[in-house]
Amino acid sequence: MAFERIFNIFVYFDDGLARHYGVRHHRRTGSDDAKCEHLRVHVDGDHPLAQRFSLPRSFTAEQWLAAQRVGDVLQYFEDALTLYRASPSPVFCLTSIVDGMPKIDRTIGPKSFRGNQVMASEIFGSFPDYLVEYVEADRLDLPRLINDDYFIAIRTLFNNRLYVSCTKLLMSCIDTLAFVEFGDQPGNFANWLDTYVTLTVHGINSEELWEFRNSVLHMTNLASRKVLSGNVSPIVPYVGTQPTLPAASPGSPKPLNLYGLIASVADGIGKWAESYNEDRDKFLAFVERYDLTTSDSRMAWCPVQGHT
């Protein structure tokens, strides 16, 4: 039986950031399971002796988890695998080393970190994984994901004339998309709108919609602090066939067609989704951040003893 070169690969996190990885190789025969077990039992001895290489980019722990969720992480170790003449599909064991110590939360196979491996819980059952449910031809269908997570409910509320609740959920949807795009930073709501949504057709700007969002989400009124101070014009949504309406008088609230705004945000989501087609690093940020969200369409159903 031929010997195969197999690899213990280590990602070194120091002070919360990974900049380097290490590789220690072995030559073994036997089944893949036996080879993997050999690598696992040598983790403690191998990681201090591994040859170190620079990662092509730095990773936080959350970013590295997202990279494993997305797919083939071996691309980040190409320099070492080329140097050691690895086979196209090498047997490997990948372990994080956190401040000098192996950190193993769970053991998984070589495939992408998805589905029940990520979402299963003994207490809460299994949560659907959007990277499984919404991937078609190796591409994530972002418009369908956002439709199911937000716009089904937004349309349901609108069609049932629950316009205030509909507006609140629309603002929450923009909040989520802005966080996913720009992270938790000031101005992300307005930045997302300015980048992807045409608001001028509605006679408003992103700052005005941000202040409207603050008032309607937090207090269910139309008067944020900046609106009350006179620094920003107030907005009042309406539902009707007229796409726009003039303000009743100078300084009075600007009318905003709610249906028109929903349509404009939906168009913006299409443009936003297109921006992920070619940018892998941006997609990693999406997975890192969207993993933190919750949704009506991704709920766990689990049996409770004594109940049906």
Which residue stretches match the model-derived regions?
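Amphipathic alpha-helical interaction surfaces
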Residues: 176-183, 195, 199, 215-223
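Terminal, compositionally biased low-complexity regions
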Residues: 1-130, 195-198, 204, 280-308
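Long, charged low-complexity segments
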Residues: 201-282, 287-292, 296-299
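Solvent-exposed, amphipathic alpha-helical segments
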Residues: 149-157, 212-216
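Short, contiguous, well-structured surface segments enriched in hydrophobic/aromatic residues
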Residues: 153-194
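Alpha-helical solenoid scaffolds in large eukaryotic transport, assembly, and signaling factors
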Residues: 137-145, 176
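Boundary/linker elements of alpha-helical solenoid repeat scaffolds
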Residues: 129-138
